[in-house]
């Protein structure tokens, strides 16, 4: 693993609530990095890719969906044992400020607040949950 960690500067501006990018790739080459933004990262056709989030190292299946909410949480997806040449990745970044002014503290958002808290060290969703939100993630690309 690369010992050098870059601090990513997101293209997310103060006037944006989301930054969404879709990439098709033959391999993962982006280095170990961190950033202050929250991130939802989706990978398709990635069986064998090695996901590193903080001190967690896992080999993923064909689909992967991870929520990262830790301030400057180090993370990277590496090629690992992946043989696919048609990897799809969708990254959605949003500012922690999106939940400012006690908005997230309202009782109706208790489950969301708990999920964001659990994602401080990275939260990987099970396959059945990924499949439930697959079309929703696709629809974000049309925004």
Give names to the regions the model predicted:
Residues 1-67, 71-73:
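Generic protein-terminus/edge-of-domain signal
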Residues 2-12, 69-139:
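A hydrophobic/aromatic-rich effector-binding and dimerization subdomain
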């Amino acid at each position: 693993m690369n010992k050098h960690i870059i601090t990513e500067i997101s293209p997310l501006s103060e006037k944006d609530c989301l930054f969404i990018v879709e990439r098709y790739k033959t391999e993962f080459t982006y280095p170990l990095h961190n950033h202050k933004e929250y991130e939802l990262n989706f990978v398709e056709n990635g069986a064998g890719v090695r996901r590193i989030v903080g001190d967690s190292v896992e080999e993923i299946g064909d689909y992967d969906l991870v929520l990262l909410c830790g301030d400057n949480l180090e993370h990277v997806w590496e090629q690992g044992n992946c043989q696919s040449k048609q990897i799809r990745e969708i990254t959605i970044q949003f500012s922690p400020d999106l939940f400012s002014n006690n908005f997230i503290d309202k009782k109706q958002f208790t489950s969301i607040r708990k999920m964001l808290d659990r994602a401080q060290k990275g939260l990987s969703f099970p396959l059945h949950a990924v499949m439930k939100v697959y079309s929703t993630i696709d629809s974000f690309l049309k925004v």
